[in-house]
Amino acid sequence: MGSGIEVNDSSTTNSNNNEKVQLSYNMKLALATGGIMGSFLLYGILQERLMVVPYKNADGSEEYFTDSTFLVLSNRVFAALMAIVIVLKRGESLKNVAPLHKYVGVALSNFCATWCQYEALKYVNFPTQTLGKCGKMLPVMLVGTFISGKKYGLKDYSIALTITTGCMIFFLTGKISNNESSNTSYGIILMALYMFFDSFTSTFQEKMFKGYTMSTYDQMIYVNGCSSIISVFILILNGRLFPAIEFISTHNGVFFDSTMLSASAGLGQMVIYYTIKEFGALVFSTIMVTRQMVSIILSTLIYLHPLSNTQWIGALLVFGTLYYKSIEDSKKKHGGHSHGGSNAATTTTPSNNSNNTEK
């Protein structure tokens, strides 16, 4: 009888422990989800605020902030400094693992991708920009095929084409320009260039991780550092460094908005790394799809972007396909299978681009 009591006590203890572990897991997941949603929703709102809403001068007149390169510089400096602080706190070495020219190649494509993203907002609205970035799966797959020799299955290409179709429905059936511009074709070209450069960034970074034993913070420091140098060089070359600083100093709110933009991007990177480490890229991908959908809804409410019914259908087609892809990838993972589809998920998942947080 005594032994029976001991067994019951043991099973009760195990049950309580399992409940505590599950509660801890759920709390961590909730914090990770809240961190990603909060940081990147704030980032999206501030990004649109900086690029498409005018700022007031001291005399009451209004001007637009036009220096996308300066925003890239601000974000990269903040991210590099944050990574340096973390590395020093962990007692790790700041020495570069890969040759410097490897980081420069990633930084250059990363800079071009981010610059194109900011510039595009001058010509197309935020929902268009966000949905356009969801359509980068096909370019990433093509770049991965030609650069890394990856192979993808018919299902991978079907998913990519469905997402691309949803994007085209969105682009062709309603207004996609911002309130101040009618030159949407230039904005679409910039978004295409963004996807091209971002695809190269993801592929180059993946090759670096495979070729060298390095931490994500090593890439953060040196890629962001190189990107900062590139940004300063371009600002000096086109004579925009000091005018950008002057604009920030003479217009209320620009400094605060740009600082918060950089802080939310840096925080977003940290939460991304934590989420992938604790829960995996598939959970992160699902969170990011939800975040992108919510950001479009918020943008339409805050900045009054009119979307047609067919545009909403196109958006739902894109996000529905992305959710389906996450479920399929999860089944493959738990089934112990790995093929081209998981590679597609890896290269198109925002988390794998550790420096381009502008998702």
UniProtKB/Swiss-Prot annotation:
GO terms for cellular component: endoplasmic reticulum membrane; Golgi membrane. GO terms for molecular function: 3'-phosphoadenosine 5'-phosphosulfate transmembrane transporter activity; antiporter activity. Keywords: Antiport, Golgi apparatus, Membrane, Transmembrane, Transmembrane helix, Transport. Residues 340-359 have a biased composition (Low complexity). It is a multi-pass membrane protein. GO terms for biological process: 3'-phosphoadenosine 5'-phosphosulfate transport; transmembrane transport. Residues 332-359 are annotated as: Disordered. It is found in: Golgi apparatus membrane. Its main location: Golgi. It catalyses: 3'-phosphoadenylyl sulfate(in) + adenosine 3',5'-bisphosphate(out) = 3'-phosphoadenylyl sulfate(out) + adenosine 3',5'-bisphosphate(in). The chain crosses the membrane at residues 26-46, 68-88, 157-177, 184-204, 228-248, 254-276, 300-320. It comes from the Eukaryota. Belongs to the nucleotide-sugar transporter family. SLC35B subfamily. Probably functions as a 3'-phosphoadenylyl sulfate:adenosine 3',5'-bisphosphate antiporter at the Golgi membranes. Mediates the transport from the cytosol into the lumen of the Golgi of 3'-phosphoadenylyl sulfate/adenosine 3'-phospho 5'-phosphosulfate (PAPS), a universal sulfuryl donor for sulfation events that take place in that compartment. This is Adenosine 3'-phospho 5'-phosphosulfate transporter 1. It comes from Dictyostelium discoideum (Social amoeba).
